Amino acid sequence: MNKRRILFVCLGNICRSPMAEYVLRHQAAERGLSHLVETASAGTSGWHDGEGMHRGTRAELKAHGIAADGFSSRKIRREDPAHYDLIIAMDDDNLAELERQFG
């Protein structure tokens, strides 16, 4: 079975979308399903490109036993919609921005 590629998207890609990315990845690993899911995240803006996760997000993940190592924020790219099977906007404003950018 092919991996399902899931992209979570919020505004800056330092809080909500990376948290969703890491939680889903962790949940899949706990259930032995990592081979079925590829997760990633991005932002609709490039304000925080290359930055790490917000410290509060990292702390919350750590409190739940989820390591948040190696994260670097990024803006959604033109090729992302073709690469991912499912893109989840973290709120209505980001959904509207995705629709504006990608139709």
Report residues per predicted region.
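Conserved active-site segments centered on acidic
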Residues: 1-84
